Amino acid sequence: MEQQKEITKGGFTLPGEAGFEKLTLELANRWGADVIRDSDGTELSDDILNAGYGIYSTICLIRDHNAWAKANIDKLQQTFLVTSPVVANSETLTIDLMEGFFKEQFLVNDSEEALEYWQVYDRTTETLLQKESWSYHPQNQTVVLTGICPWHKYTVSFMAYRIWEEISMYNHTTNNWNKEHLMQIDPIHKETQEYLLTWMDDWCKKHEQTTVVRFTSMFYNFVWMWGSNEKNRYLFSDWASYDFTVSPHALKLFEEEYGYVLTAEDFIHQGKFHVTHMPADKHKLDWMEFINNFVVDFGKKLIDIVHNYGKLAYVFYDDSWVGVEPYHKNFEKFGFDGLIKCVFSGFEVRLCAGVKVNTHELRLHPYLFPVGLGGAPTFMEGGNPTLDAKNYWISVRRALLREPIDRIGLGGYLHLVEDFPDFTDYIEKIANEFRRIKELHNAGKPMALKPRIAVLHSWGSLRSWTLSGHFHETYMHDLIHINESLSGLPFDVKFINFEDINQGALEEVDVVINAGIMGSAWTGGQAWEDQEIIERLTRFVYEGKAFIGVNEPSALTGYDTLYRMAHVLGVDMDLGDRVSHGRYSFTEEPVEELEFAECGPKAKRNIYLTDGLAKVLKEENGIPVMTSYEFGRGRGIYLASYEHSIKNARTLLNIILYAAGESFHQEGITNNVYTECAYYEKDKILVMINNSNTLQESSVTIKGRTYTKDIPAFDTVILPLE
């Protein structure tokens, strides 16, 4: 890596481990750590604590309190569960509540206050059965239905305690731990709050050497329901779901504040639950607001205690983060000093960087565990953690060039690296590389190209950059691929919702992207009923801007076209009611810079040209998969799908430039699709990166002068320009 100076200290958090003091301090020196942390399952010895480093101590507020939890079972966290539909073959039916659920995670709550919220539904007619039609039998945890309709389907929605904290449960089963299962307590109860305030104060007294308290995270985990059948172990998982925040007491408090009663069905939603990928209704939004207000109000009291002891408070933007909402206006009320995000991908870097907090820190992958999240070997025989680290780093690095991050680090069991010296060498390299990139941002933002981008969906800025979880959890959605590509492209990007459009958000952007399937939160669903949205977007494009639609953009049934923006896109999708209508023929007119080298758009059946004027840039089996439509002075672009790759990121860049009427060949863009660059104008520093596993020659023009470099595999070149 070419550079003016080497920065070898600071901005790095190392996971220490008692019993491996020599290794801990040796790697702290090599990796330039200024902070040492503990991890789930590890401790720091006095030798480490007294070695002169800052100390991060990890706390999970709602677990590690088993003695108190066992004495206060009614204060455990809960959730609504729903049985699988069962078909009745007579007028009576017995349903086993826990069939299919992981019994080490859930325990039926059949208390009087919980039973008040249980519901039994006829799913054939979607009608609620009166309580006189069913009875609960606690001895075998079954519900017996009587006087029902044979051959109809029935479900029971009930409340259950969660008796094994999910993150600990995952770590326990992954690492073959042999220790007590940790329960999770619910601070919605006054008694729990009093206990936690006292515990937090005592904890701070006992941890004098801790400089930063790392909250993991606040109170409520993302939903992660496990099943008893290993063929379908994870029944339901949604990183941004609020399902694990419910309890009879919380529901009563909600009723008092909002003036109406929430039911089990408000959460169960026909067994579909309210996944983040679908637009939220008013009841869900009210519940989210209620929980967010509580988490902020009580969370601040705990953070104030930490501050009173002269310590900093950081929050981990994963695990039990639900209700924290770092992109909500309430977040700054917490008083957090920093935020830590676990990252696999570039979009997660941008997710972290955009939060209003003093310190932004990334927890890099791979974690120092024997196996990775997918169960593949990592720090064990058959694993290649160095290659894993390189592949993760090239995704992270391209986003790091666009927005500043203050710190990076690792987590897990440090002793596992002893058998992988090439891994320790590589971490030393990227730690130094990170520090240099961090320094470049101090002088100002890198150069950005002209089109300003707005990604339009139902959640808007609240879900900036993310959908619901990591890339491998949301890969089936076009938008996460778009976000990942955008994370390292030289554009200013913002995320807006439909109300933002009515408030004038289009005045600040040049290109709007809407991507996803019909009815999803990512395309907007019923939001497209608002004629003012249509009017504003139509005028926006007509007056010279661009609308890029991917998959089923603006789709909503009930109108003359399925795509509400079909008049701007020049294409629409037929659901069958136009099967007898004629279709315009066309000739493919490819544009070299817009061709996909790999993983191109996949054809969707029944896409047709609305008036025959759209230019078909790419077709597949006679179906348009990428089109361009001139509308007034602007342009609509349609893509049947989008999949992120290094090459495709360049194609997306070109599509955006083309949509905005900008040149493909301009300064600040490398000539090699495997490479990218960032130019920091104030310091006149050019950074060129190689996103491939082979040597690449790359050229880029800055201020009229072209610079050409050979960049080794995975590597970075930093050039001071005269």
From Swiss-Prot:
Keyword check for Transferase: yes
Active-site residue list: 319
Functional description taken from the UniProt entry: Reversibly phosphorolyzes beta-D-galactosyl-(1->4)-L-rhamnose to form alpha-D-galactose 1-phosphate and L-rhamnose. Does not phosphorolyze galacto-N-biose or lacto-N-biose. In the reverse reaction, has the highest activity toward L-rhamnose, also has activity toward L-mannose, and low activity toward L-lyxose, D-glucose, 2-deoxy-D-glucose and D-galactose.
Catalysis performed (reactions): beta-D-galactosyl-(1->4)-L-rhamnose + phosphate = alpha-D-galactose 1-phosphate + L-rhamnopyranose
Broad EC category: transferase
UniProt similarity note: Belongs to the glycoside hydrolase 112 family.
Domain of life the protein comes from: Bacteria
Keywords: Carbohydrate metabolism, Glycosyltransferase, Rhamnose metabolism, Transferase
BP-aspect Gene Ontology terms: rhamnose metabolic process
Any one Gene Ontology molecular-function term assigned to this protein's record: 1,4-alpha-oligoglucan phosphorylase activity
Its EC number(s): 2.4.1.247
Record protein name field: D-galactosyl-beta-1->4-L-rhamnose phosphorylase
